[in-house]
Amino acid sequence: MTPDATRTDECRATGAASTSATAISDQAGAKASAENFPVALRFLPRRYRGHLAAVYGFARSADDMGDEAAAGERLDLLDELEADLGRLYRMISWADVPDVARGEGSTGGALGSVDGGIPSGGDPGSRNAGGSSGGHPGAVDPGGSPPRLAVVRALAPAVVACAIPAQPFHDLIAANRQDQVVSRYPTYRDLLDYCRLSANPVGRIVLHIFGAATPEREALSDQVCTALQLAEHWQDVAEDLRAGRIYLPLEDMDRFGCTERDLAAPGAAPRVRALIAFEERRARELLDAGAPIVGMLRGAARAAVAGYVGGGRAALAAIAASGHDVLRATPRPGKARVAMELVRAYATGR
């Protein structure tokens, strides 16, 4: 995003924005403790649940700042969240990071490079990038202040123990910034680029938490996460339209002869159903392409990722079962179907 030259650092750090950011941060943290991310993860060992809950709290906070705050405050709040993320990474020293978390002395689950944080020039999707993070846990700023927001402070144990790079968190913030200025996607490629920011970072963070991040696994994870994001978009077409957003690629709407007025109808016309069926099949193919990641993992990591894959398949099955009418009611899978798909993915490794 292009920085707004008229918005100064002083404006971004106003007390009003700070108060709102703190309130949203606290609420997101409470949601992370009370909700399922996803349901299957409640059965994981406590150390993993804590790290995943912290990541979920951060992601929810970014989403809430981008969706639920007053429209005129959203970019300021996201700036503050990113600045606080920068404080977190500046205060962490490599001396705090266990050898195994740095990929040293591990077997079969090395994290690989933890480089990849925001470079000193900033992320193209970022307006201020929260300061230089040094690229990974270990960049030291002895004179820096600690994070102010609860959801950012809660990330510290996971970032240190699992050597999670900064970039995925910055990408999640960039996705929410994009939501403030982009409400339509001309092409499918444009939508995939958005998913690269809004969905794929979560999978990469999860792999780091389980000590399982490798380039091959990250590539497969990206396919799974993009498919999950697409499934959610197709479930929520009506809700997104009420919020002023359409994630269906405009080129696909044109191909099937659909208009925005069609999407505002109480039920889906045949041409809309055909469009959703096309998008559902494409998301399913993407999910199936990434699903072999399950077979590359063991133990808790395998169970967690099987939960994501199974949940995605159940969501897509619900869309199909609705006759691809996502306008009359939001299609949601039942718990039994989710559990069945999880077990199947875990057992087959895909």
Model-derived regions: residue spans:
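Catalytic cores of Mg2+-dependent Asp-rich isoprenoid enzymes
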Residues: M1-G109, D141-Q229, W234, A238-R350
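Small-residue-biased low-complexity repeat regions
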Residues: S20, G105-S113, G117-G144
